[in-house]
């Protein structure tokens, strides 16, 4: 039995009602430290992680998404060429839940250089990728079996550049977020200090307005509240989280609040990365790279504004991504520069994080994706 087969077998033996399958996206540098997407299991009683195993070889699968059926995983390829064509790619994989192994299904070229993020609409009909260096977003229809069809639309993002150089040197779309009602797509552009809104017509992106952020903010990622009334945007460059009210009819955004993710008086270098809402809707979490920390906020039950609870060390260097378990009891953070995952216990009443000391080595870890146990 070769090493990969042995590790798959070991991963399968750890599967129980008290374990949770997690996939980790990575950068795959030329030195071969990482080879693609890794699978690991979280013991939901102790917080311990199993030894990571390579689930599928892939070129810089730096962001992952899950089909609503829990059986198909989508990954972007943050590369300059795919299948002999310039630009990144979008791939789909069949999940083998017992072992964590991923079987490649298809791969489509995006035509955009350096893809940074992908989003799947709630109805599982369309996949949209943001090309950070290509300055565009591209949409792909999804077939009934979850496979990705060829691209059907590409929208360039244009407008005046933000004031923060050199980062705001051109358009830099950084994320794709669908409204919970499946009506709109929101794209954060770090280079333009704007949030672009689109509608979908048979998977074709149709421009539907833009919304300005604070100059130099550098909007990166966003998350909706479950009811769709609030959109939370983490701004990479000025290390803040902005709260927007979202009109239920028009989808228009109105700025309500901006809060810092850093301690008062901190003067070191840092920039934000990921933002998540707790499954119970009461807390918001954001990561700081440089300060290497996780900021925890309470959501006001009526107006959705945020108040800082705590800022805790991320357990490594450059926390580019993290995710909460579906039951909200655990948070797993991917620290890219220290090549590790760190597990935190989440208090569902206060939102506070407790470092468990449980960690696992994953080279260039940059994305964390939980697969619900009932998938």
Task: Go through the PLM ranges and name each one.
Residues 30-35, 82-88, 132-135, 169, ...:
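Short, solvent-exposed loop/turn segments at conserved positions within beta-propeller repeat blades
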Residues 40-47, 93-100, 139-150, 198-204, ...:
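Short loop/turn segments immediately following beta-strands, especially the blade-tip
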Residues 31-34, 58-68, 111-126, 158-182, ...:
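Beta-rich, blade/repeat-based domains predominating
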Residues 50-56, 103-108, 161-166, 206-212, ...:
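A short beta-strand motif characteristic of beta-propeller blades
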Residues 50-124:
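Blade-loop segments of beta-propeller domains
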Residues 336-375:
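Blade-level signature of beta-propeller repeat domains, shared across WD40, Kelch, NHL, RCC1
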Residues 18-43:
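An edge-strand/N-cap motif at the start of beta-rich repeat modules
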């Amino acid at each position: 039995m070769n090493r990969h087969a042995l590790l798959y077998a070991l991963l399968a033996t750890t599967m129980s009602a008290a374990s949770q399958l997690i996939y980790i996206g990575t950068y795959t540098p030329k030195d071969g430290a990482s080879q693609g997407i890794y699978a690991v299991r979280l013991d939901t009683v102790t917080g311990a992680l199993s030894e990571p195993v390579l689930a599928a070889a892939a070129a810089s699968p730096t962001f992952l998404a899950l089909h609503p059926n829990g059986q198909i995983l989508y990954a972007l390829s943050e590369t300059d060429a795919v299948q002999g064509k310039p630009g990144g790619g979008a791939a789909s994989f069949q999940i083998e839940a017992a072992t964590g192994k991923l079987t490649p299904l298809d791969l489509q070229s995006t035509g955009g250089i350096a893809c940074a993020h992908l989003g799947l609409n709630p109805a599982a009909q369309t996949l949209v990728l943001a090309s950070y260096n290509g300055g565009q977003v591209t949409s792909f229809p999804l077939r009934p079996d979850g496979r990705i069809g060829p691209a059907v639309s590409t929208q360039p993002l244009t407008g005046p550049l933000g004031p923060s150089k050199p980062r705001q040197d051109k358009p830099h779309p950084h994320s794709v977020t669908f409204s919970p009602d499946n009506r709109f797509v929101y794209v954060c552009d770090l280079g333009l200090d704007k949030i672009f809104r689109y509608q979908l017509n048979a998977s074709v992106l149709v421009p539907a307005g833009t919304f300005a952020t604070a100059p130099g903010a550098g909007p990166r990622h966003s998350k909706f509240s479950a009811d769709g009334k609030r959109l939370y945007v983490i701004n990479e460059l000025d290390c803040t989280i902005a709260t927007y009210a979202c009109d239920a009819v028009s989808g228009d955004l109105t700025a309500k609040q901006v809060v810092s993710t850093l301690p008062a008086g901190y003067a070191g270098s840092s920039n934000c990365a990921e933002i998540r809402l707790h499954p119970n809707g009461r807390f918001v979490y954001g990561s700081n790279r440089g300060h290497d920390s996780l900021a925890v906020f309470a959501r006001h039950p009526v107006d959705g504004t945020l108040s800082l609870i705590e800022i805790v060390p991320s357990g490594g260097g450059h926390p580019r991504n993290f995710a909460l378990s579906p039951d909200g009891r655990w948070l797993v953070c991917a620290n890219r520069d220290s090549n590790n995952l760190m597990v935190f216990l989440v208090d569902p009443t206060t939102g506070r994080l407790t470092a468990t000391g449980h960690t696992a080595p994953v080279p260039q870890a940059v994305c964390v994706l939980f697969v619900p146990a009932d998938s």
